Amino acid sequence: GAVTPIGNNVETFWKNVKEGKNGIGSITKFDTTDYKVKIAAEVKDFSAKELMDFKAAKRMETFSQYAVAAAKDAGFNIEEEDPYRCGVIIGSGVGSLQQVEKACQTIETKGPGRVNLLLVPMMISNMAAGNVSIHFGLKGKSINVVTACATGTNCIGDALRAIQYGDAEVMFAGGTESCICPTAVAGFTALTALTTVQDPDRASIPFDKERGGFVLGEGAGVVVLEELEHAKARGAHIYAEIGGYGATCDAHHVT
C-alpha cells in the first residue's frame, strides 16, 4: 500500500509514476518567507476521516495516519488470520516534530500545564507501528525501526527475519514520514542537505552533475510479507520472494 505525493494508493501512484508526474511543489504547510528552501513533496488531498473514525484519526499524528492508510491499501484480509501470528515493523525517522513545535509554543504562551495530554503518544515514532497494530487487531510483534533514509528497507529486512525465525507468519513492513514543518526544513537546510533550487523539475536530480541536495517529502509505503507456504495455502497473489537480507554501515560520517 502507498500514500505518496503523486497518489494516495498504489494504483494512482503507479499510474502517475509511469506518466512521469512530479509531486514536488511549493510548501503549503507553513509560511516559507524567511526560508531558503521553499519546495517539498507534500501529500495532497489526504483525508484520514475516510479511512477511520473521527476519534481515532484525532488521536493520531499525520505520519501514523499515513501508515494506517498504506497498510489498509495493501489489501490484506486479516479476519481469517491468527492475530498472534501477525505483526508490524513500520519505521519513521522522525515521528512528529509538529507535536514538539506545538508543545514548545504552548509552554511559552500558556505554560507547561496546557500541553496536549496526547503529546507523547502522538509524537513518538513507534506509534506508526502501534496504530497499525491497533487498527487491524494485530497481536504479534509491533516494532519501530529508526535508521534515517534506510528505515523502510531495514523494516522489511527485520520483518523477513521475524518470519524466518518463526515469530510470525504475516508481517506488515515499511516506513512512514510526515515532517514538512519549520523545524525539519530549517534543520536539514542548516545541514546543507536540501536543494535550494526552486524549479520542481530541476530540484531532485540525484544523478546529475548539477545536483545540490535532496527534496524533503512525506508519505508511507507498506508491504505484506508472508511465510511462503502460508501464502500458497490461502491462494495469495505473490508479487516477489525475498531471498535474504543484510545490513552494514561505513562507520565514517553522520550522513
Predicted regions and their residues:
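Active-site pocket-shaping loop/turn-to-helix segments
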Residues: A2-N8, F54-K72, V115-I124, S142-G157, ...
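Conserved beta-ketoacyl condensing-enzyme motif
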Residues: T12-W14, K18-T147, T176-V185
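Condensing-enzyme catalytic core mediating Claisen C-C bond formation in acyl metabolism
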Residues: K18-G25, D199-T255
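Active-site-adjacent elements of ketosynthase-type condensing enzymes
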Residues: T32-E42, G95-Q99, S178-S204, V222, ...
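Active-site-proximal alpha-helical scaffold in enzymes
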Residues: A67-N77, S125-E177, V215-A236
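Structured loop/turn residues at beta-strand edges in well-structured enzyme cores
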Residues: Y84, G166, A186, A236-A240
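Short glycine-aspartate micro-motif
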Residues: R85-I89, E169-A173, S204, Y239
